[in-house]
């Protein structure tokens, strides 16, 4: 059987040589190689694909990364032509609070802001931001786990994300930042994009980062913090973070260890702190919505 197998291989090879050898006259019975599509054919196929209807029900989300490209296209066609680029950070926040504090707050804030606007989507949160120097380590970089990028890296990232959205057809690009160190880079990125585009379509909403306003609102609600415990942490921000995920401030572990306070205010019971956080989030989100609408209107 092995001899016959070898002979079969030789016969097939000879036939292939005769069929494919150069200069052989075309034979309707001979196999032909598939022709690669022309550039025109590839473009026609793309145009057919880009116009395809969504074959399934769309996801109810305002987060671009959670959507399919078809869902983004259809959302834009339905009027969602404002894109929000939220910036957070990965930085030390004391012994209880996760490094991604600002990112967790933004998960709740950007979602609510986009839905209240009714015409907006959120990009993925920009989590890598300037947090201090490398060598020597400065600022939050003195603490393990903090991640930093250079100012120019941060600004270029913001510009590239904003320009990506612009070329897709988003009419207004909104920058909001949950950390103070992000504000200058966002303002610079918005200014650079507006200069490139020749029109004011990128907007840095500095008023989102109104810590004094949030504290004043908290005081109106009957809560005042005492002297600082010396950590990069506050009760008002912890309460807003807990509306998204109490485990990110180690709620259960702190209660068990008798450490459930910050700056003289107890974060227990959980339900009361979350209720306050929801009111503070609502106040800041509503203010931000107004500021975004004013920026888009040119006021």
Which residues make up each language-model segment?
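Extended, histidine- and acidic-residue-enriched regions that form the cofactor-binding/catalytic faces
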Residues: 2-6, 18-174, 178-299
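Sec-dependent N-terminal signal peptides
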Residues: 5-13
């Amino acid at each position: 059987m092995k001899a016959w197998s070898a002979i079969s291989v030789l016969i097939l090879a000879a036939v292939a040589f005769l069929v494919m050898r150069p200069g052989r006259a075309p034979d309707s019975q001979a196999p032909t190689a598939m022709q690669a599509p022309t550039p025109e054919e590839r473009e026609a196929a793309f145009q057919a694909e880009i116009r395809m209807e969504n074959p399934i029900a769309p996801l109810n989300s305002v987060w671009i990364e959670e959507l399919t490209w078809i869902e983004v296209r259809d959302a834009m066609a339905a009027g969602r032509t404002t894109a929000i680029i939220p910036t957070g950070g990965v930085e030390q926040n004391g012994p209880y609070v996760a490094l991604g504090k600002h990112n967790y707050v933004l998960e709740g804030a950007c979602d609510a802001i986009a839905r209240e606007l009714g015409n907006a989507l959120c990009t993925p949160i920009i989590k890598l931001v300037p947090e201090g120097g490398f060598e020597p380590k400065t600022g939050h970089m003195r603490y393990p786990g903090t991640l930093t990028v250079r100012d120019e890296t941060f600004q270029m990232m913001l510009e590239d994300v904003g320009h990506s959205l612009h070329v897709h057809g988003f009419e207004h690009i909104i920058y909001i930042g949950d950390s103070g160190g992000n504000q200058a880079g966002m303002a610079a990125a918005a200014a650079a994009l507006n200069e490139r585009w020749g029109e004011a379509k990128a907007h840095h909403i500095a008023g989102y980062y109104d810590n004094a306003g949030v504290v004043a609102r908290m005081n109106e609600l009957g809560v005042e913090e005492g002297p600082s415990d010396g950590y990069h942490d506050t009760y008002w921000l912890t309460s807003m973070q807990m509306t998204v995920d109490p485990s990110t401030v180690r709620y259960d572990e702190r209660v068990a260890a008798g450490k459930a306070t910050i700056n003289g205010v107890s974060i227990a019971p959980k339900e009361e702190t979350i209720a306050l956080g929801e009111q503070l989030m609502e106040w800041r989100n509503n203010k931000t919505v107004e500021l975004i609408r004013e920026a888009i209107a040119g006021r």
